Amino acid sequence: MSTIHVDVVSATESLYSGEVSCVFAPASTGELGIYPKHTALLSILKPGEVRVETDKGVESIYISGGIIEVQPDVVTIFSDTAIRADNLDESKALEAKQRAQEAIENATESQDISAIQVALAESIAQLQMINKIRSKKI
């Protein structure tokens, strides 16, 4: 089986490094599916799930957005925040979502709403991943 090397790197650590059969990432234009020998590509990623598929199964990683660099034999994903799906905290994500929604409701014109919207999108993406994982376990 042909493989491609994938590295998922956050601002603080290397979260994943290994050979995979394919990787899926949430690009700004839609989900990317990357297989071995893929054409070179550079794209912006939005908050969401990165899935790496190996002969041992699928591993999911939450990213807060970032950049993906694809070469025929190597994929590198850079993100400010990356968390293994099993380590996502639903209560923290719910709190962050509530804080962001309240901040948007109480925002004045002089405040930077775009930063608040980014925080809201990140918390929603985390909650969607948690729900997806929960539904697979049932």
From Swiss-Prot:
It is found in: Cell inner membrane. The keyword Amino-acid biosynthesis does not apply. One of its GO terms (molecular function) is proton-transporting ATP synthase activity, rotational mechanism. It comes from the Bacteria. One of its GO terms (cellular component) is plasma membrane. The keyword Amino-acid biosynthesis does not apply. Keywords: ATP synthesis, Cell inner membrane, Cell membrane, CF(1), Hydrogen ion transport, Ion transport, Membrane, Transport. InterPro entries: ATP_F1_dsu/esu_C_sf, ATP_synth_F1_dsu/esu, ATP_synth_F1_dsu/esu_N, ATP_synth_F1_esu_C, ATPsynth_dsu/esu_N. It is a peripheral membrane protein. Belongs to the ATPase epsilon chain family. Produces ATP from ADP in the presence of a proton gradient across the membrane. F-type ATPases have 2 components, CF(1) - the catalytic core - and CF(0) - the membrane proton channel. CF(1) has five subunits: alpha(3), beta(3), gamma(1), delta(1), epsilon(1). CF(0) has three main subunits: a, b and c. This is ATP synthase epsilon chain. The lineage of its organism: Bacteria, Pseudomonadati, Pseudomonadota, Gammaproteobacteria, Candidatus Pseudothioglobaceae. The gene is atpC.
